[in-house]
Design a protein with these regions (language model features):
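Amphipathic, hydrophobic secondary-structure cores in small proteins
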Residues: 21-61
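Structural/interface elements that position substrates and couple domains in central-metabolism enzymes
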Residues: 41, 45-46, 75, 80-84
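Residue-identity detector for threonine
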Residues: 10-13, 23, 51, 82
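Basic, low-complexity segments
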Residues: 1-15
Length: 84
C-alpha cells in the first residue's frame, strides 16, 4: 500500500497535521482510536467517509515515520528497569 496516495498535510487544515485525503480525520485520531481498542470496522462505522484502506495507509505512514526518525520520545516511553 502506498500511503502517499491517501495521507496529506496542508497548513490550512487541522493545523498541518497529517490526515486522510479529502477529510478532516487526522492520522493522530485514528491512532488514538486504535490504541483505545477500536477495531478497523468500529472506525469505519463511526467515520463513514474513510475506508479500511485509509486506516492501513495511516498505519503505513506512522510506521515509515518511525523507521526514518533517529530519536525516540524517551520522556514519553516507559523505562526498562532491566536494561544494563
Amino acid at each position: 500500500m502506498e500511503w502517499k496516495d491517501r495521507i496529506v498535510a496542508t497548513p490550512d487544515t487541522l493545523f498541518g497535521k497529517p490526515r486522510i485525503k479529502d477529510t478532516r480525520i487526522s492520522v493522530e485520531l485514528l491512532m488514538d482510536r486504535l490504541a483505545d481498542g477500536w477495531s478497523m470496522d468500529d472506525i469505519v462505522v463511526a467515520y463513514p467517509h474513510i475506508t479500511r484502506d485509509d486506516i492501513q495507509a495511516a498505519l503505513a505512514f506512522v510506521a515509515e515515520i518511525y523507521r526514518e526518525e533517529s530519536f525516540v520520545a524517551v520522556g514519553k516511553a516507559g523505562h526498562d528497569q532491566t536494561a544494563a
